[in-house]
């Protein structure tokens, strides 16, 4: 299994259990998330509760919770939305911090294509949700989520150059 960690913080953000598609010249990875239900496990042990005097409301009060699989699996923490100025400020800092961690070839590729990816994200800014890794480190990468037209499940966007592949 492969896990993808934030290159700046070491937080686990993704794994190969969630296939990705490269967009914006490979700078962004697009990953489909899904809403899943956790809790409220209904175990059928073969007993007939009505014959035993039991009702539907008997037993443990177990609450089902809907979560997004990627957010739950990697314990992503949602952040307040950014306005355009805040986003541009974040991107400048992120580009500077990430570029310092990349080798020369990756750095050149990143700097060549990051402007297009930034414009792509700016075009979706009002529709994006922002997430950081579990450590909630300020200088780490962001994970973006949005809903495509008519979709009920979110699509996540990752900066590919900001991820480090780790074999587990």
Curated annotation (Swiss-Prot):
Residues 1-168 form the TCTP domain. SUPFAM superfamilies: Mss4-like. InterPro entries: Mss4-like_sf, Mss4/transl-control_tumour, TCTP, Translation_control_tumour_CS, Translational_control_tumour_p. Gene3D superfamilies: Metal Binding Protein, Guanine Nucleotide Exchange Factor, Chain A. Signal peptide: none annotated. One of its GO terms (molecular function) is calcium ion binding. It is found in: Cytoplasm. One of its GO terms (cellular component) is cytoplasm. The keyword Glycoprotein does not apply. The keyword Ligase does not apply. Keywords: Calcium, Cytoplasm. PANTHER family: TRANSLATIONALLY CONTROLLED TUMOR PROTEIN-RELATED, TRANSLATIONALLY-CONTROLLED TUMOR PROTEIN. Belongs to the TCTP family. Involved in calcium binding and microtubule stabilization. This is Translationally-controlled tumor protein homolog. It comes from Oryza sativa subsp. japonica (Rice).
């Amino acid at each position: 299994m492969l896990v993808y960690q934030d290159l700046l913080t070491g937080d686990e953000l993704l794994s190969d259990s969630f296939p990705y598609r490269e967009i914006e010249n490979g700078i962004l990875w697009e990953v489909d998330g899904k809403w899943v239900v956790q809790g409220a496990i209904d175990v059928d042990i073969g007993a007939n509760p009505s014959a035993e005097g039991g009702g539907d409301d008997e037993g443990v009060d177990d609450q089902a919770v809907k979560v997004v699989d990627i957010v739950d699996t990697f314990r992503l923490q949602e952040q307040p939305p950014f306005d355009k100025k805040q986003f541009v400020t974040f991107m400048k800092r992120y580009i500077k911090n990430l570029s310092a961690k990349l080798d020369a070839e990756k750095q050149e590729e990143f700097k060549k294509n990051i402007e297009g990816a930034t414009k792509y994200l700016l075009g979706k800014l009002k529709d994006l949700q922002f997430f950081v890794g579990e450590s909630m480190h300020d200088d780490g990468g962001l994970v973006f989520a949005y809903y495509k037209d008519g979709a009920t499940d979110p699509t996540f966007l990752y900066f590919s150059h900001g991820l480090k592949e780790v074999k587990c």
